[in-house]
């Protein structure tokens, strides 16, 4: 940008902009935030605001755009949502008192990972992640600036780092080391993350655990440094860092969580249709965030799981108390967000009133829990500190109808401060005095229309029309002349006005000062407020689980020390809820101690995938402390769940369906243990028939011989069912069907043994394929099943058109029938039939 011959104000802008080249600089000028040069051009397009110019008559006018300061947040939100950073430069002194250029400084840099204020606040976490590297070790730290949560872990490879970032749904990553080209490609382009660099470490280590590994320490320290560098203030609400290991929880990678629809529906990207949607009967924002966290990280500690189950049972046993509890929770605001606003110095009167309302609800919540007289609730009750002194302070100080803007006045209650009350008394009396003066002068002058008005320029004045100017008293002095009237003052009116203006100014200043003192006092309670928030959130989640257990007819699962699975009449709770009035068909899942693999066969659309997801969903629900959809359930505690359900190319990274299949299979067999759960659905369909079948069999054998994990393996390769005779720990199950009068009904019921048919042609019929095509396919399938019986020969090819449909019409005997006769078509599946048809078509 050209900087020659700039005005002092523009030179100031340029100097500040140099310090923040990667951010839009919002430069406060009076009632607007202005943007200049490229920032103005780009912002005008993104925000759809007018682009003008400064010094329009100059040879090189400076592009300029601006937004009103009072509505700037909505524009900032748009920029942040699109992945930009925004630096806020404020006026640091009153322009009226400034000598020369008004002093301006950047007071905050807002980035996608550091959003605290928003015009559209929601209850989701916004995690900012930092990663550092030392040799082959990675440190990953993350925090939520709203809640103050702060965590760190160590990871052994970059794939795990990416998986954790995906799970957190982070938008910004702070890098403590130089990425390789491949790593930057993955983070920036494939994962669409905003990348920021921080090479300095934060010096104040009171939030850090000095027992952390070096790379965990540096990741945490650089994250703190970045946050303090961008926010430029004390962040007293940040909690001490908590170290965790992925293996401390039920491990599930991003693909697994997506395929199981845990927190959002994979197809719609929305909450509805997910486990989170099913379980969310929370009443508070803190509870909603905590529930999402529990779903992301189910437990593997049986004692902690049982502790949650016992509280759910207590709530189930106390229906009326639980109803009262639910009503009380509705009066609780987002304490964590309010605490962060206090820490950031952005609290307004509305925030404090919401905090007081919340604190006033706590004694009732605590009394309800104490009234249940259950020892298992003691740890929750201990966290419910109502902080009565804080509630009393806010209630006594803040007026119930206080405006949101601090400087609007009317914030502090009458009676809270004696001096403030005196100023307000002067203002009230001054108003009465003015009314008395108006009446007196109207009577003395005989001007019936005489009245006193006010504006900022002239203050209080007598308004006299031109027709009455001859009756103006001698002690009136002229203040302004208008077209049809004049404005006058008197010494008495000026004296009262002076008293009122002084009282108004002193009142406003004192009220602001009192509010600042109260806000500072509230800041002393941040840690206690965060403890309270955690307690309320936990109560809220557990009551939510109780409500869902009751309304969805769930039961308490039992955990054994063995690997046996015995789920009687289990259901997929989300599918059942989505189906609504339709009847869901329950299925029993039984895998004995010595059974590690169920080979699941059956037609497409018959329910194989739902059956598999049902087991995984039940395990997740059980291990997060929820009750489960079944008549009874006995489960082991799994350490990890691996899935390959559904097929899709990874278009972003250019990987085919088969490559994605193999990568996910490799992830499972590389990391699974005997305590894991593996779900593979139609593995191998992304490649040629025999390649796929060979790989599927070898993977089954590897799991059987080397891992021993509980595994559901759904396949269209019917030949694999013969493995039951050679693999001791494998059993066949299938989805039952009913054939009657040429019609096929899928019963969605799992039964022992292999499927005898795949009914692919029936599925094709449901899909709406042409009748003549289906008839021809049925004849070919019959021929293949009969081994050696001549199939109806195709018609003689006479044109390019007939070549396209030759497999479906009569024709002279074709040599290709010899190839058909050589095929091993015993129990051949429809998918294999389609593969054969493709090969035959290519040879015709």
UniProtKB/Swiss-Prot annotation:
ATP binds at residues 602-609. Gene3D superfamilies: 1.10.1420.10, DNA repair protein MutS, domain I, MutS, connector domain, P-loop containing nucleotide triphosphate hydrolases. SMART domains: MUTSac, MUTSd. GO terms for cellular component: cytosol. It comes from the Bacteria. GO terms for molecular function: ATP binding; ATP-dependent DNA damage sensor activity; damaged DNA binding; mismatched DNA binding. Keywords: ATP-binding, DNA damage, DNA repair, DNA-binding, Nucleotide-binding. Belongs to the DNA mismatch repair MutS family. PANTHER family: DNA MISMATCH REPAIR PROTEIN MSH1, MITOCHONDRIAL (PTHR11361:SF34), DNA MISMATCH REPAIR PROTEIN MUTS FAMILY MEMBER (PTHR11361). This is DNA mismatch repair protein MutS. It comes from Streptococcus pneumoniae (strain Hungary19A-6).
């Amino acid at each position: 940008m050209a900087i020659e011959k700039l005005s002092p104000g523009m030179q100031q802008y340029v100097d500040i902009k140099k310090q923040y080249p990667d951010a839009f600089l919002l430069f406060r000028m009076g009632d607007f935030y202005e943007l200049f040069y490229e920032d103005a051009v780009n912002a005008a397009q993104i925000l759809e605001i007018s682009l003008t110019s400064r010094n329009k008559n100059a040879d090189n006018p400076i592009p300029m755009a601006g937004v009103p300061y009072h509505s700037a947040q909505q524009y900032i939100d748009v920029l942040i949502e699109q992945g930009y950073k925004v630096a806020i430069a404020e006026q640091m002194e009153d322009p009226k008192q400034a000598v020369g250029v008004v002093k301006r400084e950047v007071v905050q840099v807002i980035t996608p990972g550091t959003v605290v204020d928003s015009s559209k606040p929601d209850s989701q976490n916004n995690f900012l992640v930092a990663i550092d590297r030392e040799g082959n070790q990675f440190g990953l730290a993350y925090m939520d600036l709203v809640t103050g949560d702060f965590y760190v872990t160590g990871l052994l490879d970059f794939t795990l780092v990416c998986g954790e970032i995906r799970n957190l749904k982070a938008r910004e990553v702070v890098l403590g080391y130089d990425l390789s080209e491949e790593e930057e490609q993955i983070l920036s382009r494939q994962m669409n993350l905003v990348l920021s660099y921080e090479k300095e470490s934060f010096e104040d280590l009171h939030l850090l655990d000095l027992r952390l590994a070096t790379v965990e320490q540096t990741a945490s320290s650089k994250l703190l440094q970045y946050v303090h560098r961008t926010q430029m203030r004390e962040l007293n609400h940040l909690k001490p860092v908590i170290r965790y290991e992925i293996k401390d929880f039920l491990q599930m990678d991003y693909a697994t969580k997506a395929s199981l629809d845990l927190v959002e529906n994979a197809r719609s990207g929305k909450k509805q249709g997910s486990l989170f949607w099913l379980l969310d009967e929370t009443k508070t924002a803190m509870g909603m965030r905590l529930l999402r966290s529990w779903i992301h990280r189910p437990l593997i500690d049986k004692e902690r799981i049982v502790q949650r189950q016992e509280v759910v049972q207590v709530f189930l046993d106390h229906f009326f108390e639980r109803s009262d509890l639910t009503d009380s929770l509705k009066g609780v605001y987002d304490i964590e967000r309010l605490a962060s606003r206090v820490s950031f110095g952005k609290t307004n009167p509305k925030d404090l009133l919401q905090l007081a309302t919340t604190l006033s609800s706590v004694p009732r919540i605590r009394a309800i829990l104490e009234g249940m007289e259950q020892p298992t609730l003691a740890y929750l009750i201990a966290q419910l500190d109502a902080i009565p002194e804080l509630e009393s302070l806010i209630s006594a100080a803040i007026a119930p109808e206080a405006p949101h803007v601090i400087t609007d006045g009317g914030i502090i209650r009458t009676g809270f401060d004696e001096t403030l009350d005196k100023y307000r008394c002067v203002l009230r009396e001054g108003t009465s005095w003015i009314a008395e003066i108006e009446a007196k002068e109207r009577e003395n002058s005989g001007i019936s229309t005489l009245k006193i008005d006010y504006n900022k320029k002239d203050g209080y004045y007598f308004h006299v029309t031109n027709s009455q100017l001859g009756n103006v008293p001698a002690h009136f002095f002229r203040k302004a002349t208008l077209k049809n009237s004049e404005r006058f003052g008197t010494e008495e009116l000026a004296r009262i006005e002076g008293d009122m203006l002084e009282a108004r100014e002193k009142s406003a200043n004192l009220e602001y000062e009192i509010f600042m003192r109260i806000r500072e006092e509230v800041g002393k309670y941040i840690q206690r407020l965060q403890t309270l928030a955690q307690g309320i959130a936990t109560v809220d989640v557990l009551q939510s689980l109780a409500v869902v257990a009751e309304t969805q007819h769930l039961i308490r699962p039992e955990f054994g020390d063995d690997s046996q699975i015995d789920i009687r009449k289990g259901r997929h709770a989300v599918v059942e809820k989505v189906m609504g009035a339709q009847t869901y068909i329950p299925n029993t899942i039984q895998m004995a101690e010595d059974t590690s693999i169920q080979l699941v066969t059956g037609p497409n659309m018959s329910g194989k995938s739902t059956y598999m997801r049902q087991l995984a969903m039940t395990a997740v629900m059980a291990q997060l402390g929820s009750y489960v959809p079944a008549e009874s359930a006995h489960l082991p505690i799994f350490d990890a769940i691996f899935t390959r359900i559904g097929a899709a190319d990874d278009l972003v990274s250019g990987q085919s369906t088969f490559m994605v299949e193999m990568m996910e299979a490799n992830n499972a067999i590389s990391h699974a243990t005997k305590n894991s759960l593996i779900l593979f659905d139609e593995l191998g369909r992304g490649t040629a028939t025999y390649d796929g079948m060979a790989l599927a069999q070898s993977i089954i054998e590897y799991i059987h011989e080397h891992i021993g994990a509980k595994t559901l393996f759904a396949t269209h390769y019917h030949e694999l069912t013969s493995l039951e005779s050679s693999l001791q720990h494998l059993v066949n199950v299938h989805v039952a069907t009913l054939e009657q009068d040429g019609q096929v009904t899928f019963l969605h019921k799992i039964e022992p043994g292999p499927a005898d048919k795949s009914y692919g042609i029936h599925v094709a019929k449901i899909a709406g394929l042409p009748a003549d095509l289906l008839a021809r396919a049925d004849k070919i399938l019959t021929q293949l099943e009969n081994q050696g019986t001549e199939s109806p020969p195709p018609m003689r090819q006479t044109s390019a058109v007939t070549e396209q449909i030759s497999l479906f019409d009569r024709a002279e005997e074709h040599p290709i029938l010899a190839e058909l006769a050589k095929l091993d078509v015993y129990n051949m599946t429809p998918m294999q039939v389609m593969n054969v048809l493709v090969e035959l078509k290519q040879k015709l």
